A protein has these predicted regions:
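Basic/polar, cationic surfaces and motifs that engage anionic cell-wall
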Residues: 1-36, 40-41, 48, 67, ...
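Glycan-recognition patch characteristic of GH18 chitinases/ENGases
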Residues: 44-60, 64-66, 72
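Acidic, Ser/Thr/Pro/Gly-enriched interdomain connector segments
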Residues: 169-214
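Short, charged early-sequence alpha-helical segments and their helix-coil boundaries
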Residues: 230-241
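Acidic, glycine-anchored loop motifs typical of Ca2+
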Residues: 156, 210, 214, 233
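Short capping motifs at secondary-structure boundaries
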Residues: 204-205, 226-229, 247
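Residues marking the start of alpha-helices
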Residues: 110, 207-208, 231
Length: 247
């Protein structure tokens, strides 16, 4: 199952107030629900409700950084939306955010039945996270109520947690093969692109779009600093060797 999440731009998200980089891989995925009935199962209807979630989280006291969830999934359609995404720490599961991702079912899964499409999307999303190195190969899928005094993620979602977990063989630990170093990778215009950029992005945990932009350069600097290398945001022979030959 190939997932193409609806982007934040498409669902008209407000920009985050701030972001906190998530450490990876995490070993927990928590399932939530919005606890609000969803009557319009079109993309525009789901997006409207997701925007209301974001406004609600913005208006918390103290205010939250963004919509709390990493990803959101339509209760009937199974359509996937990007929340904070893989790169940023979620804010939905108190005391667990530093070691988990949060997936929210858009709707109320006690008063509404979660669909097989939604279950399949959650399972595929988790498998994608493992394959890309964001989720550890050994992980736990839990409901919010397992770690907090709440009815979340609703009854029909909670009853299907086992179905949301990918089977062994459906997921595999990421294997990053070192692409050869040709030109030095650096931030410039036109942007540098290609397989090597994707390999770098997989290592540093930035968006895997294959484009060496500001976020990737920033991720490389953080990676270089943590590995006691010269911090310049450039992938040259030393950084390339350390990044791909470390194991």
């Amino acid at each position: 199952m190939i997932l193409e999440p609806v982007t934040r731009t498409t669902w008209k998200a407000l920009p985050p107030r701030w972001t906190t980089r998530q450490k990876r891989p995490v070993d927990h995925i928590f399932i939530h629900h919005g606890a609000t009935l969803l009557g319009d199962h079109t993309e525009s209807g789901e997006a409207r409700l997701i925007r209301s979630y974001q406004r609600h989280h913005y208006n918390k006291v103290p205010p939250w950084a963004d919509v709390a969830y990493s990803f959101l999934v339509g209760i009937e359609s199974g359509r996937v939306y990007t929340g904070r995404g893989w790169r940023n720490r979620p804010g939905a599961t108190r005391r667990w955010n530093h070691r988990s991702y949060a997936i929210c079912v858009v709707g109320d899964t006690t008063r509404q039945q979660i669909s097989q499409q939604a279950i399949d999307s959650v399972r595929a999303l988790i498998a994608q996270g493992v394959a890309r190195g964001y989720i550890a190969p050994e992980f736990h899928v839990k409901g919010h109520r397992d770690v907090a005094s709440t009815e979340c993620p609703g009854d029909t979602a909670y009853d299907t947690l086992n179905e949301m977990r990918p089977l062994r063989g459906q997921v595999a630990a990421p294997k990053i093969i070192a692409p050869p170093l040709g030109k030095l990778l650096r931030l410039r215009r036109p942007r540098m692109r290609g397989t090597l950029v994707r390999g770098v992005q997989a290592n540093v945990g930035t968006a895997d779009d294959g484009v060496y932009g500001p976020h990737t350069a920033s991720g490389v600097k953080i990676w270089q600093a943590s590995n006691k290398l010269k911090v310049d945001g450039i992938v040259g022979p030393v950084t390339h060797k350390a990044m791909f030959d470390a194991g």
